[in-house]
Amino acid sequence: MASGILVNVKEEVTCPICLELLTQPLSLDCGHSFCQACLTANHKTSMPDEGERSCPVCRISYQHKNIQPNRHVANIVEKLREVKLSPEEGQKVDHCARHGEKLLLFCQEDRKVICWLCERSQEHRGHHTFLTEEVAQEYQVKLQAALQMLRQKQQEAEELEADIREEKASWKTQIQYDKTNILADFEQLRHILDWVESNELQNLEKEEKDVLKRLMRSEIEMVQQTQSVRELISDLEHRLQGSVMELLQGVDGVIKRMKNVTLKKPETFPKNRRRVFRAADLKVMLEVLRELRDVRRYWVDVTVAPNNISYAVISEDMRQVSSPEPQIIFEAQGTISQTFVNFNYCTGILGSQSITSGKHYWEVDVSKKSAWILGVCAGFQPDAMYNIEQNENYQPKYGYWVIGLEEGVKCNAFQDGSIHTPSAPFIVPLSVNICPDRVGVFLDYEACTVSFFNITNHGFLIYKFSHCSFSQPVFPYLNPRKCTVPMTLCSPSS
């Protein structure tokens, strides 16, 4: 009931032009009221006689000067705007909030659902309108496509979110890895500094003891020499102060003694020839450590691959290689044509990794071994290996880039033999201050180099093969030789 009254009141205070509640209502002589903006717009479009215009509703003429603001209607409109619809009215979402009419039309320009009164209002005048049923399917397709696109965008957004989280985790891992490396590097630097300091101080103490001992011995000799000259002077003074007989008695011996007096100069130790530790020596060590750290970035986990040629003893984890008890290895039926073969070749073993490109690094523990050979091999060559004439024929031209130790102290590299002795390798003696207990091997396939590092001596370079001819896949190579102590492939985490 109340809703019906409100609707009737709204109709009375609705502008006949825009069909909306009156805004700043103006009343004409005929009693009709219009919005100020609507009436002004109507004046511009109409062609009245001079000074007179007609009402848009009843066409009765009126004078412009007679137009009056209708404050009473304005107050009613203000009150109506404050009135809320009942719950039943509010639930009618398919009805126009302004006019209460059912929403049956769709304005294409404004893309809004409107009622028939809205369609006739100034706001939608001249717009293209359609029944909601006519455009619903079209917009359903559009919204479905938009939904599909948004779902795809959502998936992409989730993937981007996952990527950034993964990158964040990766960065945290990388930073933690770098922190660990820095701590390890500086710990190693401190260890090197402590070792260098201790070693230099020990050398100085040894030098001091040796030099002072020799100087003391020289001092004793100089004291004895001075005493001998002093005694000869005393004898001469006594003769010169005595009688003629005392002067001439034994004078020949005295003269001979005088002639034989030759002063022996003391042994000296020039200070400018001493080798004193300099900061430059430490710089060399730091440079070596930096190079070792760089190549260790390419550390690969190497294990050995058993084969039917090698007689080496291999551990279950495929990391340790040792030699059987030294003995003559007799022919294994169907494999070797000689009645016995070179023992060193029979204990050689290849790593399981076939290398055809890139940079690779690994370390081998050879502590307590008196003999070993290690490096890189291009694969076994039985025809060359089992020729008894070829004794330890480890030459690059046969696919071996190796170094070795024998008799516990002699470290050698094996190069190609000369034109005069092509069947025997050219052995290059290597100078190492500290015999390596652990050797690092770095292979750069593209640069054609194989480098060996003395890990025991802070990573100093032992030897480097350059201009290597890698015409086929190469493998890590280990040979324990006749020493039964095992050699061990170290894991990257060791």
From Swiss-Prot:
Localization, UniProt: Cytoplasm; Nucleus
First and last residues of each zinc finger (RING-type): 15-59
Cross-referenced InterPro entries: B30.2/SPRY, B30.2/SPRY_sf, Butyrophylin_SPRY, ConA-like_dom_sf, SPRY_dom, TRIM/RBCC, Znf-RING_euk, Znf_B-box
Keyword field contains Metal-binding: yes
Keyword DNA-binding in annotation: no
Residue ranges, annotated region (Required for interaction with GABARAP and for autophagy): 186-199
Phosphoserine modified-residue sites: S86
Limits of the B30.2/SPRY domain: 282-494
Modified residues (N-acetylalanine): A2
Catalytic activity of the protein: S-ubiquitinyl-[E2 ubiquitin-conjugating enzyme]-L-cysteine + [acceptor protein]-L-lysine = [E2 ubiquitin-conjugating enzyme]-L-cysteine + N(6)-ubiquitinyl-[acceptor protein]-L-lysine
Residues that bind Zn(2+): C96, H99, C118, H124
Entry-linked Gene3D superfamilies: 2.60.120.920, Classic Zinc Finger, Zinc/RING finger domain, C3HC4 (zinc finger)
Zinc finger annotations (B box-type) as residue ranges: 91-133
PANTHER family: E3 UBIQUITIN-PROTEIN LIGASE TRIM
Function: Capsid-specific restriction factor that prevents infection from non-host-adapted retroviruses. Blocks viral replication early in the life cycle, after viral entry but before reverse transcription. In addition to acting as a capsid-specific restriction factor, also acts as a pattern recognition receptor that activates innate immune signaling in response to the retroviral capsid lattice.
Name listed for the protein in its UniProt record: Tripartite motif-containing protein 5
Organism encoding this protein: Symphalangus syndactylus (Siamang)
